[in-house]
């Protein structure tokens, strides 16, 4: 039986990161993890800073690191992701992401009152999302 496809668009203020047909999506929303297939009920939800994955029409799993504020809009035939930043896993330099994670952890462990802890936590979450997306893709290859 053929898998039903639907359009996925991942858009940031700078570019269209992805625009093509997919057969499924897995995303981390504020309310929990979502699985989306063709003909899903309409939905709008806020995304967490986390890896986002989808299965292409060719059956390949692709991973994306979603960062910053992001929203997911689902209609029966199309899913649109609007987010501050998004990187496809092959665009992520794993070493740089690991260095960013270490820097964020060091800032969070410091007892300096000048540190913006919420910003450091966001940096840590962003680095972890990038690492997870990059590693997931490398494990699939």
From Swiss-Prot:
Source lineage: Bacteria, Bacillati, Bacillota, Clostridia, Natranaerobiales
Record-linked NCBIfam families: ATP_synt_epsi, PRK13446.1
GO cellular component, one term: plasma membrane
The keyword 4Fe-4S is annotated on this UniProt entry: no
Subunit note: F-type ATPases have 2 components, CF(1) - the catalytic core - and CF(0) - the membrane proton channel. CF(1) has five subunits: alpha(3), beta(3), gamma(1), delta(1), epsilon(1). CF(0) has three main subunits: a, b and c.
Similarity comment: Belongs to the ATPase epsilon chain family.
PANTHER family reported for this sequence: ATP SYNTHASE DELTA/EPSILON CHAIN, ATP SYNTHASE EPSILON CHAIN, CHLOROPLASTIC
Annotated membrane topology: Peripheral membrane protein
MF GO annotations: ATP binding; proton-transporting ATP synthase activity, rotational mechanism
InterPro entries assigned: ATP_F1_dsu/esu_C_sf, ATP_synth_F1_dsu/esu, ATP_synth_F1_dsu/esu_N, ATP_synth_F1_esu_C, ATPsynth_dsu/esu_N
UniProt function note: Produces ATP from ADP in the presence of a proton gradient across the membrane.
Localization, UniProt: Cell membrane
Keyword set, alphabetical order: ATP synthesis, Cell membrane, CF(1), Hydrogen ion transport, Ion transport, Membrane, Transport
Pfam families: ATP-synt_DE, ATP-synt_DE_N
Name of the protein in question: ATP synthase epsilon chain
